Amino acid sequence: MAKLVIVESPAKAKTIGKYLGKDYEVTASMGHIRDLPKSQLGIDVEHDYAPQYINIKDKSKLIKELKAKAKQADGVLLATDPDREGEAISWHLANILGLDPHEPNRVTFDEITKKGVQKGMANPRAIDEDLFNAQQARRILDRLVGYKLSPFLWRKVRRGLSAGRVQSVAVRLIDDREKEIENFKPEEYWNVDATLGTGHKSFTARLASDSTGKKLLPKNEAEARAIEKGLEGAEYTVGELKKGKRAKQPTPAFITSTLQQEASRRLGFTATRTMRAAQTLYEGVDIAGHGTMGLITYMRTDSLRISDEAVAAAKEYIADAYGEQYICPYKRTWKTKSVTAAQDAHEAIRPSVPGLTPDEVDKSISGDTAKLYRMIWSRFMASQMADCQQDTVSVTVYAGDYRFKASGYTVTFDGFTVLYEEATDEKEKKETSLPPLEQGQLLKLKELKSEQKFTQPPARYTEATLIKALEENGIGRPSTYAPIITTIIDRGYVEREQKKLKPTLLGRAVDGLMLEQFPHIVDVDFSAEMEKNLDKIESGKADWHKTVDDFYQGFAASLEQAEKNMEGKKVKVPDEPSSEVCDLCGRPMVIKVGKYGKFLACSGFPECRGTKRLVKDTGGICPKCGKGRMLERKSAKGRIYYGCERYPDCDFMTWDTPVPTKCEKCGSTLFRKGSKLYCAKEGCGFEMPVPKKD
């Protein structure tokens, strides 16, 4: 009889099955098979917080099939993902199938390649109870908060609202940033720049100080003009000249948080989109000449560690492709933040076969997976390459009683930058190449320019910067970053505005209530401490029952006090104004949030019950009638679609997104479907791939 191997997904089963052969049957559990009940709390608070797990309703047939296969098999191996969530799935599978969790029936794969699968199969172990308990404690904590706090929000804010332990902190961060922006008072200042020439070359230096070294930054035009006047007739000479060398090091291979941040900045991916593509790359894809294989190591990791074998493979490729001088001459190591032994069991995210280049992979995959693989591969390879070497120069220019400064650099050896440089959220200070300069050299003033500036408020969070803030504050885990953002947007607490995260009026109202009545729930330090406690459970250094009880006792007391504080009170969420007018009574319409998202309602409610669907102009023209604008609409169930504004006179509609690019053949609006753009105008038939970003 064959041995039964159970994984989460059919894709993973297919890849692993290819490596194991006919002596094994590999099947999928399709994720979790048991969970807490949806209709009730499912936790016995009075009896040590015992969870009351039930089989997931639509998994009954699958569970029956798994039991039958396990009964016939010559042994069962549980091969779910190597993290808390995967350990929990295996624990529940063992429980349902009657397996002894203390027996070596658990295997894990850091990479799904032939070698990775063989290594995992050669090292079976018992289910890690501590790892499972960490997941179980998190699940129970989140359930207690969600089920106890949500009804309170229903009564005090609006029906249908829900609250989450970690999500509430994320909303707090976003709302706090919005308050900073609102309270920010811009301050005027002026830059005074001198464009200076040396023969045919010139450079720009900025006013820095007076001759005593006192910093100067004019606060208004009068001060700037006074400095300009003081510079009339001044000689500009090279006063101080500092030359040096610096080495710029590459960034380490990705961990989960940095992968999501970089994919957001470089590719424009949401965290969810990134993890979906990464999951596909890990579980396996068909590659010409290689068959089905996992292309990257496990993508939920905090560890920066790279195996010696992978480093050697990378350096071999670098030597062949770029030359020996591009190899890092020493073993690079990066300090990983404090992680548990289980967390550090993984490597950083890297290509499972370093020699398999993106160009070769692109022949077999496309779209998000191809883009993400190229980024992961390039970042990993660059991490094993030599430093970028630069000659630096900084100059202080003397001009009468004033001092100007400029700095620049010249790349003498490109090193890792020939392949990859990290994207950034902030505008970097510009450094340019300076012409050859000598101390005491007389410079020619070509232009003296003063420019008004104002200090800028902090920027709203993007997905990338929010994930960075969550990670830096110790909130959440690699597996939770993407769901956190999805949840707070889906709940209507936060919305995207030009790729920035902005709190809605509802989100601000709920955050204000949480801050007032449950300050510890939305406290960043408190949440970070809870994450540390969960890590202690994972390491076997803390009891999960005590961790849950310590939290719940304080939470229950806060909830009881909040009920007293808010007795007879309700939080009013301000309506969002709009430019629309009610067709029934002519009053202004306001934007409200319903079960399926935002809609327009008459401000005269309840006297007038006029409503409209909220539509958004996409900028495209209807390909059917050629007259109406293409509008973004929502179906009755909240799904976004696109239709002609002339409906019902024109009934054109599509689920595919209109794009700014026009049809090269007929000039009509193009629509995006997957990785292609197409023209929907009858008889045209034009198609093209989605252009790659630079």
Segment roles from a protein language model:
Residues 282-297, 491-500:
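A short, conserved structural fragment
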Residues 112-194, 243-244:
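C-terminal or mid-to-C-terminal helical accessory/interaction module adjacent to the motor/catalytic core
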Residues 14-37, 168-215, 383-430, 588:
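Structured, non-catalytic alpha/beta "coupling" segments that mediate domain-domain communication
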Residues 275-279, 485-486:
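Short, hydrophobic-biased segments on the C-terminal half of alpha helices
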Residues 2-3, 150, 183, 224, ...:
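Basic, low-complexity terminal or inter-domain segments flanking catalytic cores
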Residues 212-252:
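Metal- or metallocofactor-binding catalytic centers and their adjacent structured scaffolds
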Residues 238-241, 250-263, 290-299, 457-469:
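Short acidic, hydrophobic short linear motifs in intrinsically disordered regions
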Residues 1-139, 148, 209, 215-225, ...:
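Intrinsically disordered, low-complexity regulatory segments
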